[in-house]
From Swiss-Prot:
Chief place of localization: cytoplasm
Localization annotation: Cytoplasmic vesicle, Autophagosome
Family of the protein in this entry: Belongs to the ATG11 family.
Motif (AIM (Atg8-family-interacting motif)): 567-570, 1130-1133
Stated name of the protein: Autophagy-related protein 11
A GO biological process held by the record: autophagy
GO molecular function annotations of the record: protein homodimerization activity
Self-association state and partner proteins as the record states: Homodimer. Interacts with ATG8E, ATG13A and ATG101. Binds to ATG8E on autophagic vesicles.
Organism phylogeny: Eukaryota, Viridiplantae, Streptophyta, Embryophyta, Tracheophyta
Name of the gene this protein is made from: ATG11
One GO cellular component term: cytoplasmic vesicle
SUPFAM superfamilies: Ubiquitin-like
Length: 1148
């Protein structure tokens, strides 16, 4: 640990601590595992800020005492910790004391002038030589004075730099505190903006509900419900709500709406005031600038450099004059430099010193002094600014926190407003909900049609798979059956056949209302939705975006377009092909109905949410752009599909025209043949009449077949009448198309309609029997509407035969015609037998229909069971809903209790943190307990009561502890006084013991070494004790006033750290002296007496040096050092050390 400041702090394991109130900085040696509390204790030891008053900030983080430094990423070389004094942040705290810089002035630091010191050259006869030591003393004085000024200047400049550094630290501390406040304010202000956004949304919704309540009531009254849903108590949509209770609810809502609006206005004004204060606080920080001060301090370094150069010059001059003096003293003056020349050269140097160097250094010193005063003023201004600024930050933080605490209250109020407007929202939501329900009925009906159609498609595919398997088994038995006995094949199970696959869809949605998409606008007009203008402008866009799931290719409508009907999990990747008994147009219409109904329902549910949503202009533009793109895509797909349908219709019309043209040609040819036969054969009129009747019959049959085919194409059954059970017989489409015309083949591929059974049978007979008669071929042409090659050749042959009737006998022709008529009759009988077989198949289908009817009844029973299960599930859901409501009410009560307890704890925390001492803490607790006791409420919960009791008990205990603490302090003071007195007594006792011990040791020494305590003689051993006057006096029973000489005292004490309490030695000399009277003392104060005394002292020294053992006597003395009375006799004893001196000496 150290208390020095480093400008570039980059050492690992060190934490830079900066005190904000005065700018002082300290380094703390620590590691990542050091606790923050240890850092705070160090700060308390070096700065005097109490542990409870410290607030530590690093960047935007507050350091918690119970955490480690690693939790905040400390220590780090590029981060510092700022220490704020909470006591100085209070509004009633005293202002900072002025900055005091205690420095020694130049006049006090100057050495005394040594102008009158004697020098050997002062007695020289030559005035020039006599002047040299004077110049030396003056130059040396100039040098010392300059060095003093320079040192004082450097110290003051260092103080200027220190003050500048401290101001920079305070500036960074202000920035950190400002960023911390700015971050806190930004979070609270963002919460305020989000709250105001939600409030404005709610306010617009509630205002619209209140303003348009009458219009909503009239809408519901004018909207008649569906006749099937009407009862005696329900005729219109208004009957869905209780109209009598609504008027009172509207009044309550209007009053609450106005009150809440006023409260929000006050809350908004509070935030305006908070914003103004924060902006004012941030604006006053702009006056905090350190650049000019740093530049000024840096610029004043030139004065130090200037003084340094002057000091070099003064030092050089001092060395010069000293060398001259030394040369004159040693008589080494050269002939070229005489003393007079040296003196004449030193004169101008003295003038430069006196008039240039020293005044310039004094001017530099004055400039640095002014800079120091300026820095002190700036530092005082900075201290006052930081003090006031931090108090403002504390105040602004308090009002921001006060505003923050109001957010939960207003959020709860918004929830209560929503609950209060629930009835009005119910009135507004009846119309859209009713329209959405009707649209949902239409969507479900369309979905059911598509679902049943796909079931038929699945049954058809499975039947085709079964027929393929049956053919494979028959071919296998036909190939291998003749070689293996039948019973073996039967035992192997090879005679089994696949069973029929029944795709059964149980009836559902049988109770749906019988309405179509057009009935939705009829029974629930669009004005019931009450779309806002913004919704109305985007309605078409949203509708088109909802329909954008249509495929762009009209001929390949994938099953994935029915994802909202959940068909993708059945045939997710397959293509929607034709469904038996339906047409592609009906499939498309059903899907479009479902999409339209779904869009209507979605708009009805989206309207109340989207109507008052606050959208930015960019979001509105994005929504409009996306809707426009999807609308353009949908319109393009519609145009392409329309073109495709027109091409298909044109192609079908061309086919129909070609068929009609060929039929007319065939009729004309038959008529021509008949007329030619009538001209050449007038004998057999009856045969010709029979032939005419048969031709007419075939024409009628052909025309009826054509009409039947057209009816089959245009008049297919509706999708909801399609049978749900399909039992299809085997078909051979490849054989049915073999003898058809190319145009008809193409048409059959497009329309995918089954051929008539008579046409298939006729075609098969033509393939098996070879060539048929002319009338049979023409019958095949009329029934099939096709132009095969073999019938065309027959017609050509018939025409050629008609042309040759003139040359042949008419009887042969009639006979041939009769044979052909007989063959046709046989064919008719075969057709009758086949018709009987078809009737049997119809009876089989009837039996299967009865079986399916039974399955249908079972399905209805299953549906009834499912309805019962659904009813039970609804009851269980209602139970869960009630439980959830109960839990919600409990949560609301707990939340209110928690908010109340939080308020109580805030009051408790403010009371705890308010006072700075124990007494203030006890008073604040007593005040809080009294305030809580005065605010007793009957409806408060047990938690609040327990909290009040705890606070009261805590206040009592704290008061007791405070009083007990005062008593303990008083006792401690008394104990300290007693302890001090005891310590003094102990010291006295110790001194007494030491004295007694010394005497005891002296007694032992005297007994041991025979110390003389009577008349002292040379060669005897004497003991001297240190008296109170600081002299060593001999222990003597008979004659006192034996004192130890100064030489002996120096001999015994120079090598010791302190003077011993006693000295024992062998006497080598005794000098007797008498204290003179005052008159004699004044008479002897002459120079001769002084010289005589000096000579006597020298004689005594020589006597001591030669270890004289004689006793000398002097009758006079010049002084009275031992404080004896006049005329008193005393003896100065000189002693020598004994062999073992360590035994006889002991330090005090």
């Amino acid at each position: 640990m150290s208390g020095s400041f480093t400008e570039s702090f980059a050492d690992d394991g060190k934490l830079l601590l900066c005190v904000a109130e005065n700018g002082h900085s300290f380094e703390f040696q620590c590691s990542e595992t050091t606790s923050v509390e240890s850092v705070m204790r160090f700060v308390e030891s070096v700065s005097g800020i109490a542990l409870s008053d410290q607030l530590l900030l690093s960047l935007d983080m507050k350091l918690e005492p119970q955490k480690l430094l690693s939790a905040f990423g400390l220590p780090a070389s590029d981060r510092e910790v700022f220490v704020f004094n909470k006591a100085m942040l209070q509004s009633n705290s005293h202002p900072p004391s002025p900055e005091d810089v205690d420095l020694q002035d130049v006049a006090d630091a100057l050495p005394p002038a040594s102008l009158h010191e004697h020098h050997p050259l002062d007695d020289a006869s030559d005035p020039a030589l006599k002047a040299l030591p004077l110049y030396e003393r003056q130059f040396r004085y100039h040098f010392h004075k300059g060095r003093t000024i320079y040192n004082c200047t450097v110290v003051k400049h260092e103080n200027c730099e220190r003050l500048t550094r401290e101001q920079k630290v305070q500036q960074r501390a202000v920035e950190v505190a400002t960023r911390n406040l700015e971050q806190y304010y930004r979070v609270i202000y963002q919460n305020f903006l989000e709250f105001m956004k939600r409030y404005k949304h709610q306010h617009r919704l509630h205002s619209d509900l209140l303003m348009n309540f009458g219009r909503d009531i009239e809408k519901l009254r004018s909207a008649k419900i569906h006749p099937y849903l009407q009862t005696e108590s329900r005729k219109c949509l208004l009957d869905f709500v209780k109209e009598d209770n609504l008027k009172k609810a509207v009044e309550n809502c209007a009053s609450s709406h106005r009150q809440f609006e006023n409260k929000i206005a006050q809350f908004q004004q509070m935030f305006v005031e908070v914003k103004r204060k924060v902006e004012e606080l941030f604006a006053c920080r702009a006056s905090l600038s350190m650049k000019n001060l740093e530049v000024t301090v840096k610029d004043h370094e030139r004065f130090i450099d200037e003084e340094k150069s002057i000091m070099q010059s003064l030092s050089k001059d001092v060395n010069t004059v000293k060398k001259l003096v030394d040369d004159c003293m040693s008589s080494q003056v050269s002939s070229s430099l005489r003393p007079h020349d040296a003196v004449s050269a030193l004169g101008p140097m003295y003038e430069v010193h006196d008039k240039n160097h020293l005044p310039k250094m004094q001017a530099c010193y004055n400039s640095i002094s002014e800079l120091l005063d300026f820095c002190k003023n700036k530092k005082n201004e900075m201290n006052n600014f930081v003090h006031g600024y931090m108090q403002k930050i504390t105040y602004v933080t308090y009002i921001i926190k006060d505003a923050k605490l109001q957010f939960p209250v207003f959020r709860e109020a918004m929830v209560r407003q929503d609950d209060l407007f629930a009835d009005l929202k119910l009135v507004r939501g009846v119309g859209p909900a009713y329209r959405a329900c009707l649209a949902e009925v239409v969507r479900r009906k369309a979905s059911m049609k598509l679902y049943m159609g796909m079931a038929g498609q699945l049954a058809e595919k499975l039947a085709m798979k079964r027929e393929t398997e049956v053919r494979k088994r028959e071919e296998f038995l036909k190939t291998h059956g003749p070689f293996v006995p039948r019973d073996v094949l039967a035992s192997m199970g090879l005679y089994d056949t696949p069973t029929q696959c029944d795709v059964n869809v149980a009836p559902y949605d049988t109770s749906l209302l019988n309405i179509e998409i057009s009935d939705v606008d009829r029974y629930a007009p669009e004005f019931l939705v009450g779309l806002h203008s913004k919704i109305a402008s985007l309605k078409s866009s949203l509708t088109m975006s909802g329909d954008s799931s249509l495929s762009a290719e009209p001929e390949e409508i994938g099953i994935d377009t029915f994802d909202k009907d959940n068909f993708d999990d059945i045939l997710a990747a397959s293509e929607l092909i034709e469904i038996a008994g339906t047409s592609k147009m009906e499939v498309e219409n059903a899907k479009l109905k479902a999409d339209l109904a779904s869009a209507i329902s979605r708009i009805c549910s989206l309207g109340p949410q989207f109507e008052y949503e606050v959208l930015d202009e960019s979001e509105v533009e994005n929504v409009l752009k996306n809707a426009a793109d999807k609308t353009a895509e949908a319109l393009q797909a519609k145009d392409e599909y329309e073109k495709h349908l027109l091409l298909m219709l044109k192609e079908k019309q061309m086919h129909c025209d070609s068929y009609e043209k060929r039929i007319r040609e065939l009729e004309q040819r038959l008529s021509d043949e008949y007329l030619q036969g009538q001209r050449h054969n007038n004998k057999d009129v009856s045969g010709l009449n029979l032939m005419h009747e048969k031709v007419s019959e075939y024409k009628a049959e052909a025309s009826s077949d054509v009409e039947g085919n057209k009816t089959h194409v245009s008049g297919s059954e509706p999708m909801d009448e399609v049978s749900c059970v399909s039992n299809l017989t085997s078909k051979q489409p490849c054989k049915a198309r073999e003898g058809m015309d190319e145009n008809m083949v193409d048409s059959s591929q497009v329309l995918s309609q089954p051929l008539d059974s008579s046409m298939l049978e006729s075609q098969q007979n033509n393939e098996k029997g070879g060539k048929d008669s002319e009338a049979g071929e023409m019958g095949v042409f009329l029934s099939n509407s096709s132009t095969a090659e073999s019938p065309q050749k027959s017609l050509d042959d018939n025409v050629a035969t008609g042309r040759g009737l003139d040359a042949k006998d008419s009887g042969d022709i009639i006979l041939e015609l009769r044979n052909e008529l007989m063959e046709k009759s046989n064919k008719l009988s075969e057709m009758e037998s086949k018709l009987n077989g078809a009737m049997e198949e119809v009876s089989n289908l009837s039996r299967e229909l009865e079986t399916n009817q039974k399955l249908l009844e079972e399905s209805q029973m299953n549906c009834a069971h499912l309805e019962n299960c659904l009813h039970e599930a609804r009851e269980e859901a209602q139970t869960h809903l009630c439980a959830a409501d109960r839990r919600a009410s409990q949560y609301t009560a707990l939340r209110a209790s928690a908010v109340k307890m939080r308020g109580l704890f805030e009051r408790f925390r403010s009371s705890v943190c308010a006072g700075s001492g124990i007494a203030d803490f006890a008073d604040s607790l007593r005040t809080l307990a009294q305030a809580l006791a005065n605010s007793v409420n009957e409806n408060e919960d047990d938690g609040t009561t327990e909290f009040r009791k705890c606070i009261r008990v805590l206040a009592d205990k704290v008061s007791f502890l405070s009083k007990h603490r005062e008593e303990l302090l008083e006792k401690c003071q008394n104990l300290e006084a007693t302890s001090e007195q005891t310590r003094k007594d102990l010291e006295e006792k110790k001194e007494l013991v030491k004295t007694l011990y010394t005497k005891h040791q002296l007694g032992k020494q005297a007994n041991k070494e025979k110390i003389s305590f009577g008349r002292l003689e040379v060669h005897e051993i004497a003991a001297f004790v240190l008296n109170q006057a600081g002299h060593y006096e001999a222990i003597n029973r008979n004659c006192p006033n034996y004192y130890l000489s100064s030489e002996s005292e120096a001999l015994f004490t120079d090598h010791l750290p302190s003077r011993p309490t006693y000295i024992v030695g062998q006497i080598v000399h005794i000098e007797r002296q008498i204290v003179k009277l005052p008159s004699q003392l004044s008479a002897s104060a002459s120079p001769e007496a002084g010289k005589t005394h000096h000579l006597c002292s020298d004689q005594g020294s020589r006597t001591l040096a030669s270890s004289s053992i004689s006793t000398s006597t002097s009758a006079t003395t010049t002084s009275n050092p031992y404080g004896l009375s006049s005329g008193c006799e005393y003896f100065i004893v000189t002693i020598a050390m004994l062999p073992d001196t360590a035994i006889h000496q002991q330090a005090s």
